[in-house]
UniProtKB/Swiss-Prot annotation:
The gene is pheT. This is Phenylalanine--tRNA ligase beta subunit. Gene3D superfamilies: 3.30.56.10, Bira Bifunctional Protein, Domain 2, Ferrodoxin-fold anticodon-binding domain, Nucleic acid-binding proteins, Phenylalanyl-trna Synthetase, Chain B, domain 3. Its cofactor is Mg(2+). Mg(2+) binds at D454, D460, E463, E464. The lineage of its organism: Bacteria, Pseudomonadati, Pseudomonadota, Gammaproteobacteria, Vibrionales. Keywords: Aminoacyl-tRNA synthetase, ATP-binding, Cytoplasm, Ligase, Magnesium, Metal-binding, Nucleotide-binding, Protein biosynthesis, RNA-binding, tRNA-binding.
Length: 795
């Protein structure tokens, strides 16, 4: 939003400098981006009157003039502008004047004729106006007046970067209100008296979309002189706000837009067939806009139409067929309130961005239309003449916005600002902002004014009080905080510890969606009905996940399609199990899952890049379980899972309870997911592994340990873990460890059998073991595994 400081001060004139004013505005939350002078630096330029104007005797394109600048003698000035003529009021740079660029005016002769000054154009005075020739001033411009004073050029343009919630400040009226509140200064608005109708001509108006257009005003003005010249004061105000002058009718609607904040539009009455209809467009309906472009409209776009065609995209852009031209005699002024929700996004969809759409999208004061119509009518009659008809208004009271009523608690205000502001100051600030305030036991209830769409919740009122009171006036205070030692159970295993462990082993953490494709999930977890979302993001994300494996497998596929030969991922997250007895009919259980695929290690010239297998992942899972410091509590038991290979899957058991699964993905599932090669996964209940046994210090034995190796032959179906556990069961007090170190199948071992080599470590804390002690323990172990598993010692 650009505005002229001098125009603002016509409304409110606080006793502050320009710098102080812009600082106030910025600190109030309306950030000032730039402050620029409205004209170049010059002096010695006066308002003059061309008394005589004749052709130069020796140059076809030059004219010899005599100009009155209020001095005793007329000035002889040679001018080359085509529009120079007798009777014109002009800007005259007298001898001694200094123009922008340090250009000094001196006495001179042009083709033999004396020239004691220069008739100036806008450009020569550093004024950004596109025009041909010299400036043409109003006929009543006072001769001899300093030109800077005449046009109030000791002024600046202030460019404010407004946030989307402050649509009320997209006008001089809005900025003046804000400055008045900040300085406790009265705002003087221009008097807008109703223009009495002089004719009875009206246009029928029908609003077919009242929710999108709750209020529509139309007024006919006949016999308008569109050839009239826009007054220089209006041109200047428009220019300083970044809008160029076009013609008096358009200039007036733009002026009201900038002054009042109300977008308006003018139609050529002769081009309207039947009457005005405000409706939604038909899908594919076309309209040629004022800039010559053609728009194909969507069915959700509001248009202003007559009985045969669309005349304008409502609140966004006018149509070429109904636009005002130099031939226009009669106009229809439009002034409406279009609901923001029905304008927002429409301009962008057609590649448009206008001053009108910018305001309507954010919200225009819905009580402004009547006064804006009267203001525009008065200016139109003053500048262009014309005969005025009555205003025709169509209004849907039920669809107009209702003022927001918001409660503000004293405690909330103090808590958020960290400072106590007196009750009287709070009430004064809110009332100066245009709110109606009622005091309650807990604080206040404020009714937002019609121009403040952004006042909706308690925090909005806190912000308003804080910024008007002044954040600089709130003293700095050190935060008051107490350091508290939080309880932490030593037995808990932090999730970060597990994350660090897996990252150290080459994994990357993944976060997958909790919403999954239901049919695909049935392949991974058949027989369990997932919770289906009533309003899913998409059909592919319509079920709550029953586990983490599905998301990880899809992530593996995603990476493999991007030429990643080695994938190692893990995820911590919730699974959602339907349960009638649980809160909201669903149990939310934290799970830890992982997946590996591709090569065992990164490609290296000195390392074989073998493909991963079941035991690679099993080792990583064992590392997680070993964090519990109780390696005797867990085991892997062969088990079937519908998503896993029947011969390469196991249940993870801790203290006799199944807490998870591990295995190679079933070949059929690999095919349906699109996996490339062998993929191994695991999934564990986090609550079953997040506690550890607190280790106890024990004395180390000072006596030597003894190792005995045995090789037992058992059926291939017997798990090696069961053999190891059987050894520990009967090994007695001297057996400290039993570990599998070799598995052999082949020559010398009967088909269907396998040889398991187990290292037995025996030691006493009290004495050196004798051969009889060791032999007794070994014999007991061999006898036990022989009886339990039919094992025999290998020769």
């Amino acid at each position: 939003m650009k505005f002229s400081e001098s125009w603002l001060r016509e409304w409110v004139n606080p006793a502050v400098t320009t710098d102080e004013l812009t600082h106030q505005i910025t600190m109030a939350g309306l950030e000032v981006d730039d402050v620029l002078p409205v004209a170049g630096t010059f002096n010695g330029v006066k308002v003059g009157h061309v008394v005589e104007c004749g052709q130069h005797p020796d140059a076809d394109k030059l004219r010899v003039t005599k100009v009155d600048v209020g001095e005793e003698e007329l000035l002889d000035i040679v001018c080359g502008a085509a529009n120079c003529r007798q009777g014109l009021k002009v800007a005259v740079a007298t001898v001694g004047a200094v123009l922008p660029g340090d250009f000094k005016i001196k006495k001179a002769k042009l083709r033999g004729q004396p020239s004691h000054g220069m008739l100036c154009s806008f450009t020569e005075l550093g004024i950004d106006v596109e025009s041909d020739g010299i400036m043409e001033l109003a006929i009543d411009a006072p001769i001899g007046m300093d030109f800077r004073d005449f046009l109030a050029l000791n002024d600046v343009t202030v460019d404010v970067d407004l946030t989307s919630n402050r649509a009320d400040c997209f006008s001089i009226r809005g900025m003046a209100r804000e400055v008045g509140v900040l300085n406790r200064a009265d705002v003087t608005e221009p008097s807008v008296a109703p223009v009495a109708p002089s004719i009875d001509d009206t246009v029928a108006i029908e609003v077919k979309a009242p929710a999108a257009c709750p209020r529509y005003l139309g007024r006919v003005v006949k016999n308008v002189n569109v050839q009239a010249k826009t007054p220089l004061w209006m041109q200047e105000k428009l220019r300083r706000c970044g809008i160029r002058s076009i013609d008096p009718v358009v200039d007036i609607t733009n002026f009201v837009l900038l002054e009042q904040g109300q977008p308006m539009h003018a139609f050529d009455l002769a081009k309207i067939d039947g009457g005005i209809v405000v409706r939604l467009a038909e899908q594919g309906e076309k309209i040629t806009l004022l800039d010559g472009s053609e728009a194909e409209l969507n069915a959700d776009t509001l248009v202003v139409a007559d009985h045969n065609k669309a005349l304008a995209i409502a609140g966004i852009f006018g149509g070429e067929e109904s636009g005002v031209t130099s031939e226009t005699k009669d106009v229809l002024l439009e002034c409406a309130f279009f609901a923001p929700d029905h304008i927002r996004g429409r301009a962008r969809s057609y590649g448009l961005h206008t001053d009108s759409s910018m305001r309507f999208e954010r919200g225009v004061d819905y009580a402004l239309q009547v006064s804006a119509m009267e203001r525009a009518t008065a200016l139109l009659v003053e500048i262009c003449g014309g005969e005025v008809a009555p205003v025709v208004a169509v209004e849907s009271e039920a669809e107009l916005p209702k003022p927001n009523k918001v409660a503000l608690r004293r405690t909330k205000l103090d808590n958020l600002l960290g400072h106590h502001i007196a009750d009287s100051d709070v009430v004064e600030i809110l009332e100066r902002l245009g709110m109606t305030v009622e005091t309650t036991a807990e604080g206040w209830v404020a009714v937002a004014p019609t121009w403040r769409f952004d006042i909706a919740i308690e925090q909005d009122l806190v912000e308003e009080v804080g910024r008007i009171y002044g954040y600089d006036n709130i003293p700095n205070q050190n935060p008051a905080a107490a350091l508290k030692m939080h309880d932490h159970q030593e037995a808990n295993i932090p999730l970060k510890r597990v994350r660090d462990l897996l990252v150290d082993r080459g994994y990357h953490e993944a976060i997958t969606y909790s919403f999954v494709e239901p049919e695909q999930q049935k392949l991974v977890v058949p027989g369990v009905d997932a919770l289906i979302l009533p309003n899913p993001i998409s059909a592919e994300m319509s079920a709550m996940r029953l586990g983490l494996i599905q998301g990880l497998l899809n992530t593996v596929v995603h990476n493999q399609k991007r030429q990643q030969p080695r994938v190692r991922l893990f995820e911590y997250g919730l699974r959602f199990i339907p349960c009638d007895t649980a809160e909201n009919g669903m149990r939310q259980e934290p799970m830890l899952a992982g997946v590996i695929a591709g090569t065992r290690s990164e490609e290296h010239w000195n390392i074989d890049t073998n493909t991963v297998d079941f035991f690679d992942l099993k080792g990583d899972v064992e590392a997680i379980l070993e964090l519990s410091a109780n390696d005797k509590a867990y085991s892997f038991v062969a088990a079937k899972h519908p998503a896993l290979h029947p011969g390469q899957s196991a249940a993870i058991v801790v203290d006799g309870k199944e807490i998870g699964v591990i295995g190679t993905v079933h070949p059929e599932l690999e095919r349906k997911f699109g996996l490339n090669g062998r993929t191994i996964v695991f999934e564990i209940e986090w609550s079953a592994i997040n506690r550890k046994v607190i280790p106890e210090a024990v004395a180390l034995s000072k006596f030597p340990a003894n190792r005995r190796d045995i090789a037992v032959v058992v059926d291939e179906a017997v798990a090696s873990g069961d053999i190891v556990n059987a050894c520990l069961e009967v090994g007695g007090e001297f057996l400290k460890a039993a570990k599998l170190f070799d598995v052999y199948v082949g020559k010398g071992v009967e088909e269907g059998k396998k040889s398991l080599a187990i290292a037995l470590t025996l030691q006493s804390n009290e004495r050196t073991l004798e051969d009889a002690d060791i032999a007794g323990a070994v014999d007991a172990i061999v006898t036990h595994v022989s009886e339990k598993f039919g094992a025999s010692l290998r020769d």
